[in-house]
Swiss-Prot record:
Binding site for Ca(2+) 2: 91, 93, 95, 97, 102
Domain of life: Eukaryota
Similarity comment: family membership: Belongs to the parvalbumin family.
Protein name: Parvalbumin beta 1
Gene3D superfamilies reported in the protein's UniProt record: EF-hand
CDD domains xref list: EFh_parvalbumin_beta
Function, as annotated: In muscle, parvalbumin is thought to be involved in relaxation after contraction. It binds two calcium ions.
Amino acid sequence: MACAHLCKEADIKTALEACKAADTFSFKTFFHTIGFASKSADDVKKAFKVIDQDASGFIEVEELKLFLQNFCPKARELTDAETKAFLKAGDADGDGMIGIDEFAVLVKQ
């Protein structure tokens, strides 16, 4: 639960329950439910660094697929369709990855 310290446990539980079934994940709903939209730029950067598991400076497809597990290790992987939609929404420059600035915009949507 690497990102759990940035959010309330009850909010994380609610957000994960809402997308428990395959193909029900909505990044907007998830970020809103866990309160990321109101987080400071520093907290958003901390979350980005956790999600960017290989410390490349970008969140790649495989890291997006495991996104929910950053909040609860037992959470499911995102489906290919969910991962593709998440990447499309966050990858403003079309390089196939989400950078820190793109992530900061994404969480505020």
